[in-house]
Amino acid sequence: MSIYSMSKSALDMFTKCLALELGPKGIRVNVVNPSGVRTDFSQAMGVDKDSVNSLLEVTGSSYPLGRIGEPIDIANAVLFLASDECSFVTAINFVADGGALWGAPPPKLR
């Protein structure tokens, strides 16, 4: 876990440093930090599809938006950051995680 966490932190700081260096040339630099996203990665590593789907459903249900991310969710975040509508944004960590960073929603009261 420490190597993974340090790698993510390094990419975040690298983004900020590049944004400072390249901003004067009109180049924007941002990073997208997704949470769990439904892909074929685990199956390619040999994990059976039912186990993957079960884990994704449990994980997604703990997110405030109540679902796991889909590749299109991350693609849309990247598209937005690359668009003219986002032309004054640089050096940010765009968190596309369905609210996962903030934890599970509060339990429903009866």
Model-derived features: positions:
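Active-site helix of classical SDR
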Residues: 7, 15
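Alpha-helical segment proximal to the catalytic Tyr-Lys
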Residues: 20-24, 87
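Rossmann-like NAD(H)/NADP(H) cofactor-binding core
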Residues: 25, 30, 92
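A short C-terminal helix-loop "cap" of Rossmann-like NAD(P)-dependent dehydrogenase/epimerase domains
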Residues: 47-63
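Short C-terminal tail/terminal secondary-structure segment
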Residues: 78-79, 90-110
